[in-house]
Amino acid sequence: MCGICGIVGHQPASPIAFEALRRLEYRGYDSAGIATLTASGDIERRRAAGKLDNLEHVLKEHPLPGTTGIGHTRWATHGAPTENNAHPHEAGRVAIVHNGIIENFAELKKELEAKGRVFRTETDSETVAHLVDDYLGQGLEPREAAFAAIKRLEGAYAIAMIFKDHEGLLIGARHGAPLAVGYGNGEMFLGSDSIALAPMARKMTYLEDGDWCELTPDHVTIFDMTGAEVSRPVQDLTFMAGQVGKDGYRHYMEKELHEHPVAIGQTLKRITDPASKRIALPEMPFDPAQVPRITITACGSAYYAGMVGRYWLESLARIPVEIDVASEMRYREPPQPDKGVALLISQSGETADTLGVLRSLKKAGQSIVSVLNVEHSTMGRESDLVLGMDAGPEISVASTKAFTAQLSVLAALAIDFARARGTMDQAREERLTASLLDLPSRAAEVFTRTKDIQAMAAVVAQARDVLYLGRGICTPIAFEGALKLKEISYIHAEAYAAGELKHGPISLIDQTVPVVAIAPSTILFDKTLSNLQEAKARGGRILAFTDAEGAKRLEGVAEQVVIMPDVDAFVAPILYAIPVQMLAYEVALLKGTDVDQPRNLAKSVTVE
């Protein structure tokens, strides 16, 4: 959600911090700010509500000097998105930036106000600055004051601090929110993730929960919550800064939509053997044949990927699967079987609710398998096995290529489990694997249908409400389509299994409601067709994604059809996800919304 950065070195800190904040825009924000130490040792800061362009204007009018600094993009949780509530927050001799929620801030604030401290914002984060400054006032040095303060914080936080009269010193801390150290040449950095650090550093360390660190231009010292010095792995950054550019596209989302074929292909390359047409996943830390049940949990689009994964695992591997959104699973505490497996899905590997479920299921004795795009994330480090995607950085808030990469991994996992459990022979495995390996070329074909999708978008863009329908394994793709439309076009959309139409949603259908159908000509096509005829009879405008055979049978029913490449029904959900995402993008263009940074949304939801 919020993005933070810190710089300590010998170059001007403000421009570096600003560019880091640019790269953190994808996380979602509503205000931003930077603070630096001047040559005289004073703290100066600049803040602005709204987009980074507003902060850039302020910085041009009033530049910030100094080689030590911190920056922040804020996604409001406590207090309105105003300049006054924007970070960095300053109290006496310290300035801080914070990502997370301080759950005991009210108690700490009351204590500090009793000492005469005056709070100037509505945020929980300002409490951290006052608490650190209070300890500085008691004679503690910055490192000691920071440690004393963070030991009293409850909740989730990633924090960076600078101190008056201490140029060349930067302190960071994390608990429940991501923070990484970047190593430069005579300079050190803090950042919410590797994307923030990529241009400045080529090596990095992810801090672990409870870690805090002291950075100078030439040295990094990491401590745990006992105050003991600890060592954490140093790793190369996995991508270069150029990978997060738009490369001539209008939006990151447009670029990432066009990267579907590559993301699918690179992901499959890691987990298949093209020569033998067989799946080649890493060795499992358990015997798949002995697993009594799989529990899948995720949030947002990753949850819909999990829904498709459930279909595959149940039908191919004949294994019971439970699935729930992480925010519910975390507090539901269902009984878990011995030798059970928890399958968690996350693009970032930092999703707060999913991470909470991971820890509770691990405590319950479940083996943890995570499907991640960022393998060295917190979830990756805490999992028993990581099935990594290779989708590359995804910057637009609305997930696109990561979704199809997740589906590709889940399809391979289902085949792997089926082989191990004896529910699939080699011939069928080879056929299904071949259909997966054919996907990148089929995905590339989808973009030749752009004009048809744009024509469909012209209808959807005029609507206030849109209904998405799917059947069987394509039902989750209807949910994905409705979510994308809501996220980036701000048009209300709902998705249903087509068979549920008569159980309520049909009462909403009239000539103002487009009905978007995900309808490949599988064995369930006849039933979907019947439901679409019912919707058309009530005045609904039928828009369909189908194949050539389906298009013939939809003549006279569908107003518009996007004819998809013919593929095996097994991989249809992966392929059909692409045009429903493209439809949302084209509608958003017509509506003139902020495609990459839709209002109120954040890319990486690192707080509950």
From Swiss-Prot:
<dbReference type="InterPro" id="IPR005855">
    <property type="entry name" value="GFAT"/>
</dbReference>
<dbReference type="GO" id="GO:0006487">
    <property type="term" value="P:protein N-linked glycosylation"/>
</dbReference>
<dbReference type="GO" id="GO:0004360">
    <property type="term" value="F:glutamine-fructose-6-phosphate transaminase (isomerizing) activity"/>
</dbReference>
<dbReference type="Pfam" id="PF01380">
    <property type="entry name" value="SIS"/>
</dbReference>
<keyword id="KW-0963">Cytoplasm</keyword>
<dbReference type="InterPro" id="IPR029055">
    <property type="entry name" value="Ntn_hydrolases_N"/>
</dbReference>
<dbReference type="InterPro" id="IPR035490">
    <property type="entry name" value="GlmS/FrlB_SIS"/>
</dbReference>
<keyword id="KW-0315">Glutamine amidotransferase</keyword>
<feature type="active site" description="Nucleophile; for GATase activity">
    <location>
        <position position="2"/>
    </location>
</feature>
<keyword id="KW-0677">Repeat</keyword>
<dbReference type="InterPro" id="IPR001347">
    <property type="entry name" value="SIS_dom"/>
</dbReference>
<feature type="domain" description="SIS 1">
    <location>
        <begin position="284"/>
        <end position="423"/>
    </location>
</feature>
<keyword id="KW-0808">Transferase</keyword>
<comment type="subunit">
    <text>Homodimer.</text>
</comment>
<dbReference type="GO" id="GO:0006047">
    <property type="term" value="P:UDP-N-acetylglucosamine metabolic process"/>
</dbReference>
<dbReference type="InterPro" id="IPR047084">
    <property type="entry name" value="GFAT_N"/>
</dbReference>
<dbReference type="GO" id="GO:0097367">
    <property type="term" value="F:carbohydrate derivative binding"/>
</dbReference>
<dbReference type="InterPro" id="IPR017932">
    <property type="entry name" value="GATase_2_dom"/>
</dbReference>
<dbReference type="GO" id="GO:0005975">
    <property type="term" value="P:carbohydrate metabolic process"/>
</dbReference>
<feature type="domain" description="Glutamine amidotransferase type-2">
    <location>
        <begin position="2"/>
        <end position="218"/>
    </location>
</feature>
<feature type="domain" description="SIS 2">
    <location>
        <begin position="456"/>
        <end position="598"/>
    </location>
</feature>
<dbReference type="InterPro" id="IPR035466">
    <property type="entry name" value="GlmS/AgaS_SIS"/>
</dbReference>
<dbReference type="GO" id="GO:0005829">
    <property type="term" value="C:cytosol"/>
</dbReference>
<comment type="function">
    <text>Catalyzes the first step in hexosamine metabolism, converting fructose-6P into glucosamine-6P using glutamine as a nitrogen source.</text>
</comment>
<keyword id="KW-0032">Aminotransferase</keyword>
<dbReference type="GO" id="GO:0006002">
    <property type="term" value="P:fructose 6-phosphate metabolic process"/>
</dbReference>
<protein>
    <recommendedName>
        <fullName>Glutamine--fructose-6-phosphate aminotransferase [isomerizing]</fullName>
        <ecNumber>2.6.1.16</ecNumber>
    </recommendedName>
</protein>
<dbReference type="Pfam" id="PF13522">
    <property type="entry name" value="GATase_6"/>
</dbReference>
<feature type="active site" description="For Fru-6P isomerization activity">
    <location>
        <position position="603"/>
    </location>
</feature>
<dbReference type="InterPro" id="IPR046348">
    <property type="entry name" value="SIS_dom_sf"/>
</dbReference>
